[in-house]
């Protein structure tokens, strides 16, 4: 994967997250902001999830209250380089915990 393809795929990931949050019908207020390649999800209780791209490594990094994870693209899924879990699984787990209600991105 070259840098432009990486950025295209990361942009697509950001857009999907933003669209899912805009379309959700939950009780809690969840905001999403993109600034300089960093996506910040802010929850009603003030907690945050930070997602950023690491261009030199072609990775997506996820930082939550539970810790940080690094993801490599394998096939059509972003996979954690430590646990083998998918980006969507870990993001949903963290968002659900931080929101205090089920949050789905799929």
Swiss-Prot record:
The keyword Iron applies. One of its GO terms (biological process) is iron-sulfur cluster assembly. GO terms for cellular component: cytosol. SMART domains: Frataxin_Cyay (SM01219). PROSITE patterns: FRATAXIN_1, FRATAXIN_2. Keywords: Iron, Metal-binding. InterPro entries: CyaY, Frataxin/CyaY, Frataxin/CyaY_sf, Frataxin_CS. GO terms for molecular function: ferric iron binding; ferrous iron binding. SUPFAM superfamilies: Frataxin/Nqo15-like (SSF55387). The keyword NAD does not apply. It comes from the Bacteria. Belongs to the frataxin family. Involved in iron-sulfur (Fe-S) cluster assembly. May act as a regulator of Fe-S biogenesis. This is Iron-sulfur cluster assembly protein CyaY.
